Amino acid sequence: MPFGCVTLGDKKNYNQPSEVTDRYDLGQVIKTEEFCEIFRAKDKTTGKLHTCKKFQKRDGRKVRKAAKNEIGILKMVKHPNILQLVDVFVTRKEYFIFLELATGREVFDWILDQGYYSERDTSNVVRQVLEAVAYLHSLKIVHRNLKLENLVYYNRLKNSKIVISDFHLAKLENGLIKEPCGTPEYLAPEVVGRQRYGRPVDCWAIGVIMYILLSGNPPFYEEVEEDDYENHDKNLFRKILAGDYEFDSPYWDDISQAAKDLVTRLMEVEQDQRITAEEAISHEWISGNAASDKNIKDGVCAQIEKNFARAKWKKAVRVTTLMKRLRAPEQSSTAAAQSASATDTATPGAAGGATAAAASGATSAPEGDAARAAKSDNVAPADRSATPATDGSATPATDGSVTPATDGSITPATDGSVTPATDRSATPATDGRATPATEESTVPTTQSSAMLATKAAATPEPAMAQPDSTAPEGATGQAPPSSKGEEAAGYAQESQREEAS
């Protein structure tokens, strides 16, 4: 039985916790993310090492949805540049997802260790990402969280391939998507502007990745006071909406025109005019000889160390400020005027957020060239203009990530991404105005992801992690269905039923 997974339906057959420990040795936790703990696991039969992601069902609906989503998507895909699913076990209390183990380094670390780094090296990285994304897009899958942190080398060999990880935000594109999701510095204009979007958001993110790899700088940044996070983020989103970036000197002086052309086409503001992943693979900078061999390591590394190795900002402060601004668009200016005092009581800071959101869409950003967005700061996208949005509220997390909600709200995560929340703080009216929610809607009903992450970090882990032995024993898992697409659809349907409940 290659996969210890459940058959979806009214009657569920769960794996027994002992099935996991009978087959795998789970070491100590090597990383804690928003939704799961990550272990290095050893197959007792083959001795092969894998990565294990353990999701606790008791941690909430968003955690269960993320696990089901990742399982469903990974069962659909098989590509050399995507970490492959090895095994799945679902007990009554946990999800265990076993993946290939990537032992190489992140792309940033690889660049810093090189003696020679040129456009050709960047072209090789971008080509592999484009090939993986073109494959995903052929299946109508949108990754939605492409960023440098999710690109790693498969091993430490000289010619190691690049692999893409982290699929808990990936989504089947059944019609255009509307929930905001991703990592702020990589968000496409249509996501920041709360428009419906699809596969082109991944191509925009690849353009941002390419820009950083060629210059060491993020394309959108502002020079602000060290603690002025609100202005930084307000201007960041305004610049993204306008596509306001430059190939500034001296960082781009030695970069070929072909490279600049591909970046420009990937970062086209209008999503219907943006180059596709398949088209980008055929671009001369990827498939031809247009990429330069000139060594650009010194300039790129200097900027990487300046922009991304510095202190990673005070995330909690930055996210809290941004969340206040994000809550404000949910109420129209008319509704806010009619119930200002009630709004101030129920959602502190919302009024200040409204002012920031209005400024975000109405004023131009000052130019700057020193301050850069931190490598792993993750915050929620701002509204495109002063026009209020009608989707849900946002709750800040302590590490600066954001997650899309089923109703369009954004809740910060802990791994630099954006995932769906479940409650609403404003109800849209038929005339486009938003009606403030009652007081109880502002009270969280479940423990926040930030609190759970803090608990996980503070609680010492045993030498060997075991599945919950108190979980009720059930029948053994069923073999996977013959159709991966049907199984993935099953996970998606179950997730939707859970949200509806």
From Swiss-Prot:
Domain Protein kinase, residue spans: 24-286
InterPro entries: Kinase-like_dom_sf, Prot_kinase_dom
Predominant location: membrane
Cellular component aspect of the GO annotation: cytoplasm; cytoplasmic vesicle membrane; glutamatergic synapse; plasma membrane; synapse
Region (Disordered): 327-501
Record PTM Phosphothreonine, positions in chain: T435, T459
Compartment(s) where it occurs, according to its Swiss-Prot or TrEMBL record: Cell membrane; Cytoplasmic vesicle membrane
Compositional bias segments (type: Low complexity): 331-365
UniProt GO MF annotations: ATP binding; calcium/calmodulin-dependent protein kinase activity; calmodulin binding
Membrane topology: Peripheral membrane protein
SUPFAM superfamilies xrefs: Protein kinase-like (PK-like) (SSF56112)
Bias kind Polar residues: ranges: 387-428, 438-451
Entry keyword set: Calmodulin-binding, Cell membrane, Cytoplasmic vesicle, Membrane, Phosphoprotein
Cofactor list: Ca(2+)
Cited function: Does not appear to have detectable kinase activity.
Family: Belongs to the protein kinase superfamily. CAMK Ser/Thr protein kinase family.
Subunit structure: Interacts with calmodulin, in the presence of calcium.
Recorded domain comment: The protein kinase domain is predicted to be catalytically inactive.
PANTHER family assigned to the protein according to its UniProt record, in alphabetical order: SERINE/THREONINE-PROTEIN KINASE
Protein name: CaM kinase-like vesicle-associated protein
Species the sequence originates in: Homo sapiens (Human)
Organism lineage string: Eukaryota, Metazoa, Chordata, Craniata, Vertebrata
